[in-house]
Structure formats: C-alpha cells, structure tokens
Amino acid sequence: MPHSKHPSSHPHIIIYTDGACKGNPGPGGWGAVLRSGSHEKHIHGGEKLTTNNRMEICAVIFALKALKQRSSVELWTDSQYVQKGVTEWLEGWKKRGWKTASKDPVKNADLWQELDTLLPDHDISWHWVRGHNGHPGNELADALANKGVEEFLP
C-alpha cells in the first residue's frame, strides 16, 4: 500500500488526530484538526461506551471522511496502535481474514475495515507524534477529543 505523497495537483492537507476515554471502556471522544494552507477545520465526536483505541481509529476515519476530494495527506497521530496498524499490520490482517499473526480475531476489525475502504481515496503519509508533549496540532486534537468525551459524561 503506497504511503507517499501525491503530485502537487492534489490539495495538501495536514491532519492531527486524537482519541480519549474516561475509563477504558467508558465515555470516549475523538478529535481531528484538518489544515490546508491558511484554512483550518476542527471536528470532534464521541460515544457513550467505547475504548481509547476505538476513538483513535474513529478520529482518523472521520477526518478522512471530511475531505471533499482526493488529497495528499500528512496524518499525525499520537497512537502507535493506529500508526502501526495502518503501516505494518493491516495488510497481514486482511490476508489472514482479519486475524492476527497468532490467529486471534483483530480487535476493532469493524473500524479497521471501514478505515481500509478510505485509504485508497487519498495518498497518506503516516506520522507518529509523542502525545502530551507540547506539539500544537496534537494538543488541539487532544482538546477536541476531550470535548467529545464531555458530551457523553453523565
């Protein structure tokens, strides 16, 4: 699966994603920051009962769904689960019928399968950033994810 950048004929979008959960499982939220030139869009959402990893994947799914056209995407996540899932594990999971190397069912397969359908629509370079380390894009995505959590707190 190619993860290089598209020629300049496609818009260049920088995306920062994050997921959060109060309890794991518990109320969770996801957030994403999408930047194109001087334009910036913030999106967030959540679920009443979920896990942090599910929210991390949802952040990427909803960010990619928010793109209106094929784009060259630079995607930043603080989730090694998401970054490695896409760049290292996904192809093997598909070849094994959504089983891990140890023959166990892939956790969150429903979301991984949905994400997999979106990947061919864009040329994405995947980047990991250390969370809660002062990176402005990641901090903003984290704040949006926590806003998503708050909407589902009792």
UniProtKB/Swiss-Prot annotation:
Query: One of this protein's GO BP terms?
Result: DNA replication, removal of RNA primer
Required cofactor(s): Mg(2+)
Q: What is the lineage of its organism?
A: Bacteria, Pseudomonadati, Pseudomonadota, Betaproteobacteria, Burkholderiales
UniProt keyword list: Cytoplasm, Endonuclease, Hydrolase, Magnesium, Metal-binding, Nuclease
Source taxon at top rank: Bacteria
Q: Which reaction does it catalyse?
A: Endonucleolytic cleavage to 5'-phosphomonoester
Specify the protein name: Ribonuclease H
* Positions with a binding annotation for Mg(2+) 2: D18, D142
Its source organism is Polynucleobacter asymbioticus (strain DSM 18221 / CIP 109841 / QLW-P1DMWA-1)
Q: Which GO terms describe its cellular component?
A: cytoplasm
Q: Which residues bind Mg(2+) 1?
A: D18, E56, D78
Where it mainly occurs, coarsely classed, is: cytoplasm
Location comes to: Cytoplasm
EC annotation from Swiss-Prot or TrEMBL = 3.1.26.4
Chain's role: Endonuclease that specifically degrades the RNA of RNA-DNA hybrids.
The family line of this record is:
Belongs to the RNase H family.
List S-S links within the chain: none
| Subunit-level organization | Monomer.
Gene3D superfamilies, per this entry?
Answer: Ribonuclease H-like superfamily/Ribonuclease H
Query: Could you state a single Gene Ontology molecular function term?
Result: magnesium ion binding
